[in-house]
């Protein structure tokens, strides 16, 4: 393990030049990326997360190069599986693959169930992986299914079914079903509080988030979001809601894509696609029934989800992207802001950034803009770690026969 850790420190942190101070600071910090699509490529196309890939934005070699110490490992169940009610089966298939990949690469990455695990794994020179469900684990919010997923190692789950409303919580990107949360949605939140699971409000409607803040006894986490003041789209968060999330002790991870924070790129991507990136109307229009294997074949070409071909001249620079975080800090304070890249989930990163290997460029930009080192360490990872500790390290759940 010492040999692995020495190798980690010897790796170049980014292809582009950054200062020695930035390099040393990044190496010494806990870099906690709150949202990464780790295994969707492997599920549909095979392969090993431990091998460097010729395309895409994530694999373990590039994560190590980027200095990543912990990440929310997305279990992403796409909307394609919902009309046939395959969402729970697909969740289990992805968790099975995730655990298999973690075991196969146990010298590099390890499952983390709480903040103590993250710290222990990080000290050992490995990446700590927190399983986070993106999409619907069960569209009806079955608490038994939720408990079973907890037992399998899941420690975070989104309220909504990605960009679709489920039967207990509304999404920001679809027609409301329950006007925020219904009684079952409130029961899901109470059970997640009891279990010590992160309530991930990314993709949830503002109304659902407001109501979740009233019900939850624990802080809420937006693993990958944006600022509506900079780009007025459903997937970004208005300032007043950000303040409320922070007031409850939560944290907001900012997605790295230009689509979230740069209206010019959002308009470019929308014009070229003929629809906004969250539009899944083609799925709802499919002729049914379809087998799960047929759905797999329809979904496979989507992965890995790559960024757009928007011209470099339109893209934010790393420094300009850090300016987004500065605006967020001005609103909620430096203790409530984090990074949730969404790599391999389709973001168009800042100019000169191509993959998770390039995260050190953000640290360099923070220093260039005059950020003090304590603030940098908070935003890179300590804020997310603090909230994860608060949520997961209570007395622990009791399971009754």
What are these regions (language model features)?
Residues 40, 193-212, 335-346:
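Extended hydrophobic secondary-structure segments
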Residues 142-146, 208-217:
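Distinct, well-ordered alpha-helical segments
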Residues 219-225:
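Short hydrophobic/aromatic-enriched beta-strand-loop microsegments
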Residues 6-16:
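Hydrophobic h-region of N-terminal signal peptides that target proteins for export
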Residues 187-201, 207-211, 239-247, 327:
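Substrate-binding cleft of carbohydrate-active enzyme catalytic domains
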Residues 179-187:
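Active-site glycine-rich loop that binds ribose-phosphate moieties when present
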Residues 1-3:
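Positively charged n-region of N-terminal signal peptides that target proteins for export
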Residues 15-179, 228, 232-401:
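N-terminal hydrophobic targeting/anchoring segments and the immediately downstream early-domain regions
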